[in-house]
Amino acid sequence: SCALMPQSDSLVPWLSVRDNVALPLVLAGGLKRDARAQAQEALEGLALGSFSSHRPDELSGGMRARVAFARTMLTPASAILLDEPFGALDALTRADVCDWLAGILDEESRTTIIVTHDIREAVQLADTVHVMSARPGHITDIIPIDLPHPRGRGTRRLERFHALCARVEDALTNTHARTEHEGTPCQSHE
């Protein structure tokens, strides 16, 4: 099974924040009381504990994104797909949530696929970065990320981190140059 966090938060507007986060556990057959307790703990980890009884429309976009993060991470699934998960967050919150997610990924053994355009996020969170071209689904480079765990805020200060970011950037630049010469998928190559 796979949990998905789409770019939009997709929160249920008539449920409280806590019940939105608990929803996947309840749908999987868990007791509502236990699911709500786990949801509250996840919300506390994202500095949203005091907003657990609020409705989604009472939160900022960044807060709703963090609620969606908590819900996705509590979903009982063997794999997780995060589509631009940090897009709605300001720079400071983005760094905090990235550190929070890095901690969770270090603790869990679930396969996690993160779709992002942010090289720093990819290098901090991934074990492997797959560089894709403008042609959908075409992988042009695979870069192993050999950074120590756990990967918190200090990771972004390591020389190796910056070297890996440069390597990913070079791969993206080379991919972009190749794609421009190849044309778009709809163009004829006669």
Give residue spans per PLM region.
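Hydrophobic anchor residue at the start of the ABC signature
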Residues: 5, 69
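Catalytic "switch" loops of ABC-type ATPases
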Residues: 7-12, 118
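Short coil-to-helix segment of the ABC ATPase nucleotide-binding domain corresponding to the Q-loop/switch region
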Residues: 15-22
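Conserved ABC ATPase "signature" region
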Residues: 26, 33-51, 103
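Conserved ABC ATPase signature
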Residues: 55-59, 63
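A short, proline-enriched helix->beta-strand linker immediately N-terminal to the Walker B motif
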Residues: 74-78
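Catalytic Walker B motif of ABC-type/P-loop ATPase nucleotide-binding domains
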Residues: 80-83
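Helical segment within the ABC ATPase nucleotide-binding domain
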Residues: 94-109
